[in-house]
Amino acid sequence: MNNPAASPRPSHERYFFEKFGITERLLERCLGEALAAGGDYADLYFESMTATALGVDEQIVKSASQGTSAGCGIRVLSGERTGYAYTDDLSTDRLLHAARTAALIASGPAKQHVQGFTETPAADLYPVPLGGFDLDLAARLELILRADRAARAFDPRIVQVRASYSEELRRILIAASDGAFASDTQPLCRLNVFVIAKEDSLSTRGSAGGGGRAGLEQFTGSKSPESLASEAARGAILQLGAVPAPAGEMQVVLGPGWPGILLHEAVGHGLEADFNRKKTSAFAGLIGQSVASSKVTVVDNGTMAGRRGSLNVDDEGSATQETVLIEGGVLRGYLTDKLSARLTGAANTGSGRRESYQHIPMPRMTNTYMLAGDDSPEDILRSVKRGLYAVNFGGGQVDITNGKFVFSASEAYLIEDGKITAPVRDATLIGNGPEALKYVSMVGHDLKMDEGIGTCGKDGQSVPVGVGMPTIKLDRMTVGGTGR
């Protein structure tokens, strides 16, 4: 195997070679069997996962688990068809059986040969000891107990607190018939706090979380248990004094950071190549055309150190990259994996992702955000006579085919005469993603990424992602609410 000296990454494949007896010869045999029926391409995806989860509810440990899993998924492509089989038994016989099963998607004599392996050069975005995390639960438990104590101390109206911690260490090895060879060790941690506040007969909720591709050392500053607990409690207490949200079409200002989830959902999914190849996206066929305000530039960047959505290599063994999707309002391209790149002739953007070895890869976002502009957040707010300032979001729904969305704002305020006034409750933003981008008239210089809590679902698969944006102003958007 050719291992380019230019790559700064350590090699992680020894884990699978030593623990499971995997060899390069076995990889070549499996790929050969996968191509034997005439497939165009085949790949192997080995995964070994160690996961830990802890939960405290009302100061009582309600859940605690640690587990490991391992397996291999084998994929064969034949034209536009995909054959896939997986096994949690990494013995030679079961791997070869899975390869032959995946090969059934094709029919005919072998027409492709396995090329010599060349390791993918990639960055080292989240260095971790190859021995993995210390499995002692005491330090993890103390984190969530600190969060519980801080939330309760914030205000006597906080009547219920739940805190949880999750952690995984994922090791992968990828070998493909086109010679791609990659391995990685991927840490991921997340701390969440949920609270309920009550005053008289009114109950409100608040939540906050943080995490990323690092260990416990990341839970300091804005991600400390105390900071997250205070943020969750602040949100719940704020809602106790909120007024009903106004309804109608108005100017809307989105705050920096987590509001980027609206960009991710209402626009980002529509820029994934599989939807566009099948012409089920509102952005299909629009490359080179104006799809947003000239102030809007949107990128997807899988190379941000330590971020929740970052990857040294994607789940097909390709290096991740920064991909410009919309530049100055003009659509520049889509997020592609190997299949969509091969079928459309586009470049592979290293966006092939999957939930686990039991799932096929598909084009997915990593860290998606709008670039900063030149406006100050203060000037943006001052420019609004009457409108809504939305700084945090809960759930939402999006129709990829037309870009229509409905999002609930978990924290929002009235803007009156250029000033933030009363907090509002039950505000929803209703619109169309591509259309909304055309109404962006001001973009702040305060780009911020989320705290590392995003999880994205698509076709039954969930993967960690990051989102972000600066403060932006939309000249028109429909707001749903019960106030005036």
What residue spans do the PLM features occupy?
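N-terminal small-residue-enriched
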Residues: 1-484
